[in-house]
C-alpha cells in the first residue's frame, strides 16, 4: 500500500518545473499522478521545489491545521506552486482543470519517523 509520505509526493511534488509549463499542465498532471481515476479531485496544489526543501518545512513554523490538529507547519519562505482547480465544464471521466501559478508559503501536515509531509493543508 502507498505510504502517506509517498502519496504526498505523488500528489504534490513537481520539482522538475519552476512553474506550470502550459495551460494543459493541470490536465496532464492530475491524470498522470492518478487524481482522476475514480473521480475528479476538485483542487490540488503542486509544489515546484526540491523534495528536501519541502520536507524541511516540517521543522519550520508550527501552526494549527485547518482540521484543528497541531501537526502543521508553514514554510519560512515562499515557494513556487501551481493550484489546479476543476473548471466548470469538467465532468468525470473528462476532468478539466485550470492552473493558477503563485509564489506562496505552504502549510503541510507532518508525521512519522522520519518526520515528513503527509498532507498539503494550505498556501498563504
Curated annotation (Swiss-Prot):
Keyword Secreted listed: yes
Tissue specificity as recorded in UniProt: Pancreas.
Protein location: Secreted
Entry EC number(s): 4.6.1.18
Listed CDD domains: RNase_A_canonical
Substrates-to-products reaction catalysed: an [RNA] containing cytidine + H2O = an [RNA]-3'-cytidine-3'-phosphate + a 5'-hydroxy-ribonucleotide-3'-[RNA]; an [RNA] containing uridine + H2O = an [RNA]-3'-uridine-3'-phosphate + a 5'-hydroxy-ribonucleotide-3'-[RNA]
Superkingdom classification of source: Eukaryota
Active-site residues annotated for this sequence: 12, 119
Region (Disordered): 1-24
Gene Ontology biological process terms from the UniProt entry: defense response to Gram-positive bacterium
GO function terms (MF aspect): lyase activity; nucleic acid binding; ribonuclease A activity
InterPro entries: RNaseA, RNaseA-like_dom_sf, RNaseA_AS, RNaseA_domain
Keyword annotations from UniProtKB, A to Z: Disulfide bond, Endonuclease, Hydrolase, Lyase, Nuclease, Secreted
The UniProt record lists the keyword Transmembrane: no
Record's compositionally biased regions (Basic and acidic residues): 1-13
Disulfide cross-links: 26-84, 40-95, 58-110, 65-72
Family to which this protein belongs: Belongs to the pancreatic ribonuclease family.
Subunit structure: Monomer. Interacts with and forms tight 1:1 complexes with RNH1. Dimerization of two such complexes may occur. Interaction with RNH1 inhibits this protein.
Record protein name field: Ribonuclease pancreatic
Amino acid at each position: 500500500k502507498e505510504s502517506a509520505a509517498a502519496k504526498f509526493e505523488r500528489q504534490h511534488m513537481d520539482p522538475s518545473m519552476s512553474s506550470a509549463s502550459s495551460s494543459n499542465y493541470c490536465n496532464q498532471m492530475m491524470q498522470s499522478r492518478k487524481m482522476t481515476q475514480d473521480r475528479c479531485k476538485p483542487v490540488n496544489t503542486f509544489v515546484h521545489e526540491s523534495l528536501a526543501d519541502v520536507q524541511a518545512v516540517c521543522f519550520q513554523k508550527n501552526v494549527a491545521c485547518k482540521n484543528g490538529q497541531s501537526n502543521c507547519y508553514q514554510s519560512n519562505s515562499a515557494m513556487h506552486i501551481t493550484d489546479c482547480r476543476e473548471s466548470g465544464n469538467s465532468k468525470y471521466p473528462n476532468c478539466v482543470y485550470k492552473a493558477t501559478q503563485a509564489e506562496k508559503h505552504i502549510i503541510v501536515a507532518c508525521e512519522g519517523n522520519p518526520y515528513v509531509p503527509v498532507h498539503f493543508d494550505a498556501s498563504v
